[in-house]
């Protein structure tokens, strides 16, 4: 007989795990389904934000800022730093430690509030009386639970461009761009939104030559004009990003040697050659395989 809960939450990102904790605090028998696994294959809570989004990106931003400050920010104090080196492996290990500490915190809250953590891909499998049947699949096996109510908190995933295959080694979305094993000499970024600017800033501070291609003719078009204008100064003059607006992306050719990207700018055919390419053109709902 299937396990029965008052509430089942599909997704353990910021919306999902908080919903599950609150439901449990209100006395409801609660389960939370999460399919995320880290590169070692270990199941983890926290969703995109905690594992491959907000938290690790801020950890890398802090590390890269410290490195840049050591090189260029101490002159007014009479301090000159020479021979400074960035240990990328150690920086990435620190990032993973920050993430691990926070995921353990969520696990502790789940145990404290007696929330059942179901590991796998959750999908609706039809009605069960006035409630729902939910199927949890993992590694070819599946189990079914029932719930009086279901909270869908499956978040979003990176939008990919047609004809631009992402392997998260040479051509990357946020997942791959947070885990480069070394600083690329030349980094291309498609998209000058928050994600593209953050990731571009990280690797630029560490020494990469970063070129950002943005389809819109206006920088940060959704922001207030004064904010956009100041941000442009910060990212181009202070951070050193080469941002090219109104760039129409064409053919992208990737190999182990790098990427060749053809695009149109001001009516002229241009080509960008880089060692790695980050595709950051927004997010789409993560609703594949959610069921009826």
Label each residue range with its predicted role.
Residues 2-15, 183-193:
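Beta1/beta-strand and adjacent pyrophosphate-binding region of the FAD-binding site
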